[in-house]
């Protein structure tokens, strides 16, 4: 048996099983994310939320998914059918593909590559193409204009996200996500995590993630009460479901990045409790709760305000933070606190 797993066939089978496990975990989480999002929103508004299908409404998401799947797919006249169907599939698969390099515990990662952060950014950057393709292939000017706005929004906040992560890379000297988590290991538990030295960037990263995922209060592309569905206006049935699934998976990816980069991933918050994958899952669901609460309580921004914040506030702050972290790490300022994280230190 050991010889089989060491063979090319065993390696291929191992990769296939790991890929299926990642897909099963993310898609299973997706079901409860939609349910939790609706329940939290209902609780803030003093409603009950989903409560009919299944116990406590737990099967409501399955019922909604089945409803979308069995509906007729209405294709607009003059639409490019190939691109029309490729766009939602591409958006969901790229978000799902990024989880290949997300570690849930020590050794629990499908591809432990040294450029894991670059891999995630490459996958998330390509999601813009799915949005533009969906708007263009619909052969309608309104979805196309919405797709251009969405692309501008996503690209604008990717710059800030990248600069924030550069600060973490300077602190650890690595782009490997497992190495970043291990750099946060220490005798003081959560006080060793990067949320403390990088506290301002935690806030900036979270807000930028909201804009990157088109989540309220930055859901200007598909504001339900104003723009119907933005670039998804001409989509229905399963293609629309794939677009929505892609957005939730991208949000879950941001929850994973927040947990890994700033909150120790699978590390325990207190030294006397064992580390484990459950800490990673708990932290991811905490950040999902924060995403859901922001959706429920924060009013929507105007588009010009969104772009102004991204380019005139977040970009200078994140760039200045990179310079500050580089200086602190290079010259071992503040009692050598940054020295142990310095590149080459």
UniProtKB/Swiss-Prot annotation:
EC numbers on record: 7.1.1.-
Topology with respect to the bilayer: Multi-pass membrane protein
The family this protein is said to belong to: Belongs to the complex I subunit 1 family.
Protein name per UniProt: NADH-quinone oxidoreductase subunit H
Top EC class of this enzyme: translocase
Localisation: Cell inner membrane
PANTHER family membership: NADH DEHYDROGENASE SUBUNIT 1 (PTHR11432), NADH-UBIQUINONE OXIDOREDUCTASE CHAIN 1 (PTHR11432:SF3)
Functional summary from the UniProt entry: NDH-1 shuttles electrons from NADH, via FMN and iron-sulfur (Fe-S) centers, to quinones in the respiratory chain. The immediate electron acceptor for the enzyme in this species is believed to be ubiquinone. Couples the redox reaction to proton translocation (for every two electrons transferred, four hydrogen ions are translocated across the cytoplasmic membrane), and thus conserves the redox energy in a proton gradient. This subunit may bind ubiquinone.
Catalyzed reaction equations: a quinone + NADH + 5 H(+)(in) = a quinol + NAD(+) + 4 H(+)(out)
Highest taxon above the source species: Bacteria
Keyword terms of this UniProt record: Cell inner membrane, Cell membrane, Membrane, NAD, Quinone, Translocase, Transmembrane, Transmembrane helix, Ubiquinone
Main location class: membrane
Protein's organism: Paracoccus denitrificans (strain Pd 1222)
Pfam hit, one: NADHdh
GO MF annotation terms: NADH dehydrogenase activity; oxidoreductase activity, acting on NAD(P)H, quinone or similar compound as acceptor; quinone binding
Quaternary context: NDH-1 is composed of at least 14 different subunits, Nqo1 to Nqo14. The complex has a L-shaped structure, with the hydrophobic arm (subunits Nqo7, Nqo8, Nqo10 to Nqo14) embedded in the inner membrane and the hydrophilic peripheral arm (subunits Nqo1 to Nqo6, Nqo9) protruding into the bacterial cytoplasm. The hydrophilic domain contains all the redox centers. NADH-quinone oxidoreductase forms a supercomplex with ubiquinol-cytochrome c reductase complex (complex III or cytochrome b-c1 complex) and cytochrome c oxidase (complex IV), which stabilizes the NADH-quinone oxidoreductase complex.
Cellular compartments per GO CC: plasma membrane
GO biological process: aerobic respiration
Residues passing through the membrane, by range: 15-35, 82-102, 115-135, 161-181, 190-210, 240-262, 278-298, 309-329
């Amino acid at each position: 048996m050991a010889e089989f797993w060491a063979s090319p066939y065993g390696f291929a089978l191992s990769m296939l099983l790991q890929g299926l496990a990642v897909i099963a975990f993310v898609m299973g989480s997706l079901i409860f994310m939609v349910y939790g999002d609706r329940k939290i929103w209902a609780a803030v508004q003093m409603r009950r939320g989903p409560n009919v299908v299944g116990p406590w409404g737990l099967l409501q998401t399955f019922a909604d998914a089945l409803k979308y799947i069995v509906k007729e797919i209405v294709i607009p006249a003059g639409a490019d059918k190939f691109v029309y169907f490729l766009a939602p599939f591409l958006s969901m698969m790229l978000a799902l593909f990024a989880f290949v390099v997300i570690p849930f515990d020590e050794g629990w990662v499908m591809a432990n590559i040294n450029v894991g952060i670059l891999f995630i950014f490459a996958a998330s950057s390509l999601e813009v193409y799915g949005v533009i393709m969906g708007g263009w292939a619909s052969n309608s000017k309104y979805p196309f204009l919405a797709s251009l706005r969405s692309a501008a929004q996503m690209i604008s906040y990717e710059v800030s996200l990248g600069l924030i992560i550069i600060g973490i890379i300077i602190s650890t000297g690595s782009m490997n996500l497992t190495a970043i988590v291990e750099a946060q290991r220490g005798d003081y538990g959560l006080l060793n995590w990067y949320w403390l030295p990088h506290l301002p960037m935690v806030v900036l990263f979270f807000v930028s993630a909201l804009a990157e995922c088109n989540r309220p209060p930055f859901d200007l592309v598909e504001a339900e009460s104003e723009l119907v569905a933005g670039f998804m206006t001409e989509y229905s049935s399963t293609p629309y479901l794939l677009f929505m699934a892609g957005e939730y998976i991208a949000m879950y990816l941001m929850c994973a990045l927040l947990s890994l980069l700033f909150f120790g991933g699978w590390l325990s918050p207190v030294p006397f409790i064992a580390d484990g994958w459950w800490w990673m899952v708990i932290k991811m669901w905490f950040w999902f709760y924060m995403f859901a609460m922001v959706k429920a309580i924060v009013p929507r921004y105007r588009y010009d305000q969104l772009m102004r914040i991204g380019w005139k506030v977040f970009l200078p702050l994140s760039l200045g933070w990179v310079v500050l972290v580089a200086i602190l790490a290079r010259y071992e300022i503040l009692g050598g606190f940054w020295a142990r994280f310095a590149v080459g230190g």
